[in-house]
């Protein structure tokens, strides 16, 4: 796994990086390995279809990273049932930028 950065999840350090083989083995764009404290995503060029724009691939990659970080937050909180709920995790990952914008507009962050 190519190490890109460390992310603090509720006081626990996760290592985030890319590993196409690990993701492809799980038929996923990303993985959150709770016990290994790793967040893994596909490389940018492997996101979406080969003919997708780089901008679209970057949007998808950021969404996948958010998705895996949310899995980690639920796991570190002991909320494994929520972490296993892909619909909930995906909804938060997709909507979070809009929620953050609304929170900032409301001056409550």
Short names for language-model regions:
Residues 3-59, 72-76, 80-95:
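Active-site scaffold of zinc-dependent metalloenzymes
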Residues 60-68:
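Short alpha-helical catalytic segment bearing the HExxH-like zincin motif
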Residues 95-102:
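Short, basic alpha-helical nucleic acid-contact segments in DNA-binding proteins
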Residues 104-109:
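Long, well-structured alpha-helical subdomains associated
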């Amino acid at each position: 796994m190519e190490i890109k950065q460390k992310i603090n999840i509720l006081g626990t350090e996760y290592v985030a990086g890319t590993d196409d083989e690990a993701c492809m083995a799980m038929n996923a764009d990303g993985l959150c390995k709770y016990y290994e404290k790793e967040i893994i995503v596909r490389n940018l060029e492997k996101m979406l279809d080969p003919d997708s724009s780089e901008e679209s691939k970057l949007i998808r990659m950021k969404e996948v990273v958010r998705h895996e970080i949310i899995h980690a937050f639920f796991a570190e909180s002991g909320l494994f049932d929520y972490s296993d709920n892909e619909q909930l995790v995906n909804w938060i990952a997709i909507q979070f930028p809009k929620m953050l914008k609304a929170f900032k507009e409301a001056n409550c962050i």
